C-alpha cells in the first residue's frame, strides 16, 4: 500500500494525497489513488 507521500494526486500538492476527502500527509491510503472514499490508516 503506498504511503501518502508516494501519491501524486491531481490538484493536490505532490507530497499529499486525499483520503476520505481529507488531505493527509502521514500514514497510508487504502486506495493508491487517494479517492474520496479512501481512508487514511
UniProtKB/Swiss-Prot annotation:
Q: Where is the signal peptide?
A: none
Example GO CC term: the record gives:
extracellular region
- Cell attachment site (motif): residue ranges: 33-35
| Compartment annotation | Secreted
Q: Does the keyword Transit peptide apply?
A: no
Keywords on record: Cell adhesion, Secreted
Any matching Pfam family: Ornatin
Q: Known InterPro entries for this protein?
A: Ornatin
| Top-level taxon of the source organism | Eukaryota
User: Could you mention a single GO BP entry for this protein?
Assistant: regulation of blood coagulation
Q: Which family does it belong to?
A: Belongs to the ornatin family.
The task this protein performs is described as:
Potent inhibitor of fibrinogen interaction with platelet receptors expressed on glycoprotein IIb-IIIa complex. May prevent blood from clotting during either feeding and/or storage of ingested blood.
Q: In its UniProt entry, what is this protein called?
A: Ornatin-A3
| Taxonomic path | Eukaryota, Metazoa, Spiralia, Lophotrochozoa, Annelida
Amino acid at each position: 500500500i503506498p504511503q501518502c507521500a508516494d501519491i501524486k494526486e491531481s490538484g493536490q500538492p505532490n507530497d499529499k494525497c486525499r483520503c476520505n476527502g481529507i488531505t493527509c500527509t502521514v500514514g497510508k491510503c487504502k486506495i493508491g489513488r487517494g479517492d474520496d472514499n479512501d481512508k487514511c490508516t
